[in-house]
């Protein structure tokens, strides 16, 4: 049985950060310092994830990134040489689609974090709006994060890396992972490059999938062979969770995602 790669990363103390590489995020390059003002670096219990600031007090990430003593770092580019406007917060409250925090490979891998206090917009910090419409298959999408830059071993970069991939038909992911019996319909998006070589990987969980400028997905899971041919990754579909997100932010903290019988 193929072991599925869950994108959250367990940091090992002996790991050293890569200074330079020709194989970032898997197939990308160092992000422009000004293109990821909304990108959060989420850490807890030695784990690393990404996240997306959606307003001054709320961050979206993946449910499987949940942990104790969560810290959310904003305004980060280089982890070794922090920006002067870097701001760090802790998770005041964490909300899940279901109170038990249950999620599957194809549903409910989403977590909404309320920060202990608001962040201020600055040169390197600004929220990303929620999507106004669902994405279309064929869209060009941007992925980013501080995840491993090697498909064969964990090498964590000092700076985030970015790459463009394509939004694929969900059926492509169903065909790629037959052993998991993915349902015919899902609240997840399938994205990658069929020829391989560009992908999220270990440590990129919870980071954004931005399609045609809109925040459409949250990095969830994929093949252990990051960037492998015809093995794209899956992303929680933000648009399908808008009612839940907006209800929680408005104060209806008992809101749950509607049940869908796949």
UniProtKB/Swiss-Prot annotation:
Q: Name one Pfam family in it.
A: Trypsin
Q: Where are the transmembrane segments?
A: none
Which residues are connected by disulfide bridges in this protein? 31-162, 49-65, 97-257, 141-211, 173-190, 201-226
Q: In which tissues is it expressed?
A: Expressed by the venom gland.
- Residues bearing carbohydrate: 102, 169
User: Active-site residues?
Assistant: 64 (charge relay system), 109 (charge relay system), 205 (charge relay system)
Peptidase S1 domain boundaries:
25-250
GO annotation, cellular component aspect:
extracellular region; secretory granule
State the signal peptide span: 1-18
Alphabetical keyword list: Disulfide bond, Glycoprotein, Hemostasis impairing toxin, Hydrolase, Protease, Secreted, Serine protease, Signal, Toxin, Zymogen
List the GO molecular function terms: serine-type endopeptidase activity; toxin activity
EC number(s) reported in the record = 3.4.21.-
A GO BP annotation? proteolysis
Q: State the function annotated in the UniProt record.
A: Snake venom serine protease that may act in the hemostasis system of the prey.
Question: What name does this protein carry?
Answer: Snake venom serine protease catroxase-1
Q: Which organism is it from?
A: Crotalus atrox (Western diamondback rattlesnake)
Taxonomic lineage is: Eukaryota, Metazoa, Chordata, Craniata, Vertebrata
């Amino acid at each position: 049985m193929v072991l599925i790669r869950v994108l959250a990363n367990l940091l090992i103390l002996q790991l050293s950060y890569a200074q330079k590489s020709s194989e970032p995020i898997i197939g990308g390059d160092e992000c422009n310092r000004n293109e990821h003002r909304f990108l959060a670096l989420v850490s807890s219990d030695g784990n690393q994830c990404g996240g997306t600031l959606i307003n001054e007090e709320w961050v979206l990430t993946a449910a499987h990134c949940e942990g104790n003593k969560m810290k959310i770092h904003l305004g980060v580019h280089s982890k070794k040489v922090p920006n002067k406007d870097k701001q760090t917060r802790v998770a005041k409250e964490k909300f899940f689609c279901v109170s038990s925090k249950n999620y599957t490979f194809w549903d409910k891998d989403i977590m909404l974090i309320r920060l202990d206090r608001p962040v201020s917009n600055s040169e390197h910090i600004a929220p990303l709006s929620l999507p106004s419409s669902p994405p279309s298959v064929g869209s060009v999408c941007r992925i980013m994060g501080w995840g491993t830059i090697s498909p064969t071993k964990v090498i964590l970069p000092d700076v985030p890396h970015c790459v463009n991939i394509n939004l694929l038909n969900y059926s492509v992911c169903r065909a790629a992972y037959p052993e998991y019996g993915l349902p015919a319909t899902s609240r997840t998006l399938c994205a990658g490059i069929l020829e391989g070589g560009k992908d999220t990987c270990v440590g990129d969980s919870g980071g954004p999938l931005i399609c045609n400028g809109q925040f459409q997905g949250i990095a969830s899971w994929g093949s252990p062979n990051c960037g492998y041919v015809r093995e794209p990754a899956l992303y929680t579909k933000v648009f399908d969770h808008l009612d839940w997100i907006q209800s929680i932010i408005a104060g209806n903290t008992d809101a749950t995602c509607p049940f869908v019988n796949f």
